[in-house]
Amino acid sequence: MLRSLLLPAMACLMFSPPPEPVDLAVRNVRIVHGDGRVTPRATLTVRRGRIAAISPGEVRAGVRPGRDVDGAGCTLIPGLIDAHVHVTDWALPLLLRHGVTTVRDLHNAPGYILPLAREEAANRPRILAAGALLDGPGSFWKDARIISTVADARAAVRDQVAGGAAVIMVYTRLPLALIGAVVQEARARGTPVAAHLGRATAVGAARAGVSSIEHLSGIADAASDAPGRLLAAHDHFVGGWTMAEREWARLDPARLDEVARALRAGGVVLVPTLALHEAFSRLADPDLLRDPALAGVPARVLDREWDPKDIMSRAGWTPDTMRDFKAALPVLQRFVAGYVRMGGRVVAGTDTPQQFVVPGASLHRELQLYVAGGLTAAAAIKAATADAADLLGISDHVGTIDAGKEADLVLLEADPIADISATSRIRLVIRGGSIAYER
């Protein structure tokens, strides 16, 4: 009798499947998926660098994780994307430590950035790069690729794409006709075009087909009652930025709405870099150098390149300029929120490591500025995850938390939907399925 009772139990043991090994499990965690979905409590497992499963409650029976993380009270978000950077070696570890697992580099030495972008590495962010930017004669940047004709534009795009560029960046001294030629050639090769505008308005560039407009450039020019004056000012790089920035505080809100509607109709994505706009407005602030985020910046960089008085002197900026820049910032913020409300897309970017735009920390500040301007926290997170991945053409494998996607994840100590500043309260950063940073 005892034997007959034991036989079924022994059979179950003999034929039960072995425990399913996974590399990592995060249990009992709230998941903000990046596209607006929220799962209040779940367990996520990772295997071979990808999200294996998302299950309600505890780890599924039969799953044996190599590393088991209790996520109770925490929130898991997708790895963050900064869609406007200029990579340096010292910036990469800072970016990853702040949860930035992907970056789009929009100008750098091609011999440095393009080979780096080809190398997949779990100890730094994924890089999609433009190589050298394309600009007209007299460019502010000595390493820009100079184009003067339509033939130049087409050849430059062919060369950039052949060299591995994932995006083409056009700059301030290019007129609309040459921007259009760049877009046409890039489109034939399935490559997007980003634009920092100077000699073309944002509306013109959107109609020409650029994928994204950086820094909200060309918008003040399009909304101004004297656009020719602003367009001409961009012949001097800093002078053009200064005049456009000051113009924002004077613009008619109704005219800005018209421009926003035209941009939305053109389907262009805005990459506002509000953290950069704010950083420039704070150069005369006495507490600027006391920002705790500066602790991550090498002393040699702070001493040589980040002296606020020296920056203002070289740019010809005065305390009055700073006041005008501060007055412009809330107008920029409201424009961003309004653009999203009318159905336009905004993607988070910072221009780090521009002075006082600290790698990683500045992206969290970018999101805070969006929310302070009227965007919801969920929309701000989407701008740095799902929408950013879509702009970069990588939404099939990153940008949201879904089974099968790459395990680029950030575990937060609080809920960023309730308080956007929680994106900076990082407990773990997971890059390609491996824990890259742990507080």
PLM features: what roles do these ranges have?
Residues 5-23:
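Bacterial Sec-dependent signal peptides at the C-terminal "C-region" and cleavage site
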Residues 20-22, 31, 35-77:
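Histidine-rich, glycine-flanked metal-binding segment
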Residues 31-43, 56-57, 358, 376-381, ...:
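Acidic, glycine-enriched loop/beta-strand segments at the rims
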Residues 74, 80-86, 196, 215-218, ...:
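Histidine-centered divalent metal-coordination motifs
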Residues 78-87, 137-152:
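Active-site mouth loops of central-metabolism enzymes
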Residues 92-114, 125-133, 162-174, 192, ...:
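Divalent metal-dependent hydrolysis catalytic cores, especially in the metallo-beta-lactamase
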Residues 160-169, 174, 223-373:
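Active-site neighborhoods of metal-dependent hydrolases
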